[in-house]
């Protein structure tokens, strides 16, 4: 039975003299390249190419239907189908479910017999369009992804297309779906993107912080028992010269002892937005009794999970560019096309890493073992620590097994960060819940490098070198080189 998937996402679409040649496609709906997101009560009007012209208001709608049917969204008003929780299964809302971590998680939870709802404004696809980037792996539209999943498994995933910064949209979505758990991936997740220029720095903070506050209010107003599973980042901690604990540290000062939130030393406007999120969530747990798990995730690599490997239309995105690509993914693509691995600076930057298959496993464990009402708990979500030099050496060794001649070069570091430092982060809580990690030494070839070789003809080598400088960020909007 077809599901009508609601949106009250409104967009102000900029007029264009050559509209037909400058369109962005989501499913069957076309959007001009240049537009401004509009939220109902937001003081911010962000993204790129804002204009003073009178702009047309368009209501965006989305549908999912079985593969052998076609459904046309009615014009005029939004509507929801509330199936009710008659199955007794837990209902999980995945905000940002069209993204890298969100899509893999949504499929994994659906397979595990959760009732899943994806909420997404699809803006991540727009970022690629604006910056001239593309996923290494071809990715289908979210509508086709969901239809294919239903065709293969018989399982339905609800879809609500809209902006969680628009509280009216979010409220209607909450009232419609009635989630037991909210998994919140729905944030601008790139540090380099947040450092391109002022407008993108502002967008990152506005989108991430206001969106999370809206989620907290929605839980308070419509679903007080709901468990928030929020994706944070290990980057909140920075690189202190002491061990990194899981969220909290017990200290003795002037003869008195207390357990306090671990100090935060964020290194970009993106990482700072995550710090603000953590503070806001901790406050509302204390003040309102919300239950929340903050997953401070390390750097994720890989593309394949058991579910995304079922069909090409379920394939996840694989970012390799200098804006959205993570270090290991970038190195594997560079090796595949014969480009030297680009190590930033001295290469001693050490971080926690995990396979995308472990991301979905961690989220499932957090859902199955929820926080108590009023509890704010923090899990450090990674499985192994590596320096950038270590990663380059691993990729070089793996490349040799495939007959690749892999070289490494040092390039000026575009970031402001320590290039040699102490790093020892604790990560025991998820292991205690039953996490069984996929280690990089066992999975580098099958999870990353083979995909890079398979799709190497899709690589745009102009996107390999760093293009965003932490020190050169300014007020003037920047267009990355094509």
UniProtKB/Swiss-Prot annotation:
InterPro entries, per database record: Epimerase_deHydtase (IPR001509), NAD(P)-bd_dom_sf (IPR036291)
GO biological process, one term: glycolipid biosynthetic process
Binding residues annotated for substrate, in chain numbering: 189, 233, 270, 297, 327-330, 342-344, 415-417
Compartments reported by the entry: Plastid, Chloroplast stroma
Transit peptide: 1-61
The keyword Plastid is assigned to this record: yes
PTM per Swiss-Prot/TrEMBL: The N-terminus is blocked.
Reactions it catalyzes: sulfite + UDP-alpha-D-glucose + H(+) = UDP-alpha-D-6-sulfoquinovose + H2O
Assigned EC number: 3.13.1.1
Residue numbers annotated as active site: 233, 270 (proton acceptor), 274
Keyword check for NAD: yes
Top EC category: hydrolase
Keywords: Chloroplast, Hydrolase, NAD, Plastid, Transit peptide
Functional note: Involved in the biosynthesis of sulfolipids found in thylakoid membranes. Converts UDP-glucose and sulfite to the sulfolipid head group precursor UDP-sulfoquinovose. The sulfite is delivered to the reaction center by the FMN-binding domain of FdGOGAT.
Subunit and partners: Homodimer. Interacts with FdGOGAT (via FMN-binding domain).
PANTHER family tied to this protein: DTDP-D-GLUCOSE 4,6-DEHYDRATASE-RELATED
Protein name from the UniProt record: UDP-sulfoquinovose synthase, chloroplastic
Organism: Spinacia oleracea
Lineage per the UniProt record: Eukaryota, Viridiplantae, Streptophyta, Embryophyta, Tracheophyta
